[in-house]
Amino acid sequence: MKTIVLLFVLALVFCTLEMGIVEAGFGCPFNQGQCHKHCQSIRRRGGYCDGFLKQRCVCYRK
């Protein structure tokens, strides 16, 4: 049971570290393509608008 909990916590931490959050908008909420292009410009795979009223640009890694 302890190993399952430990693996779950490690997976949760790993998934959290895989996302880079950009707070300044970068086109969100009206231009998700601009957010995606911004994320690619900082060597991420892409991005999308997220958060309250889609005002935050979230980048995902390669």
Swiss-Prot record:
Disulfide bonds join C28-C49, C35-C57, C39-C59. Residues 1-24 form the signal peptide. Changing R44A: Moderate decrease in abmility to block Kv1.3/KCNA3 potassium channel. Its main location: secreted. Changing R45A: Moderate decrease in ability to block Kv1.3/KCNA3 potassium channel. Keywords: Antibiotic, Antimicrobial, Calcium-activated potassium channel impairing toxin, Defensin, Disulfide bond, Immunity, Innate immunity, Ion channel impairing toxin, Neurotoxin, Potassium channel impairing toxin, Secreted, Signal, Toxin, Voltage-gated potassium channel impairing toxin. Changing R43A: Important decrease in ability to block Kv1.3/KCNA3 potassium channel. The record marks K37, R43 as: Key residue in interaction with Kv1.3/KCNA3. It is found in: Secreted. GO terms for cellular component: extracellular region. One of its GO terms (biological process) is defense response to bacterium. It comes from the Eukaryota. GO terms for molecular function: potassium channel regulator activity; toxin activity. Has the structural arrangement of an alpha-helix connected to a beta-sheet by disulfide bonds (CSalpha/beta). Dual-function peptide with antimicrobial and potassium channel-blocking activities. Shows inhibitory activity against Gram-positive bacteria such as S.aureus, B.subtilis, and M.luteus as well as methicillin-resistant S.aureus (MIC=0.1-20 uM). Does not act on bacteria by disrupting membranes. Also moderately inhibits Kv1.1/KCNA1 (25.2% inhibition at 1 uM), Kv1.2/KCNA2 (30.5% inhibition at 1 uM), and Kv1.3/KCNA3 potassium channels (IC(50)=510.2 nM, 61% inhibition at 1 uM). Inhibits potassium channels by interacting with the pore region. Does not show hemolytic activity. Belongs to the invertebrate defensin family. Type 2 subfamily. Negative results: has no inhibitory activity against Gram-negative bacteria. Shows very weak inhibition of the potassium currents mediated by the Kv11.1/KCNH2/ERG1 (11.6%), KCa3.1/KCNN4/IK/SK4 (3.9%), KCa2.3/KCNN3/SK3 (7%), Kv7/KCNQ (5.9%), when tested at 1 uM. This is Defensin BmKDfsin4. The lineage of its organism: Eukaryota, Metazoa, Ecdysozoa, Arthropoda, Chelicerata.
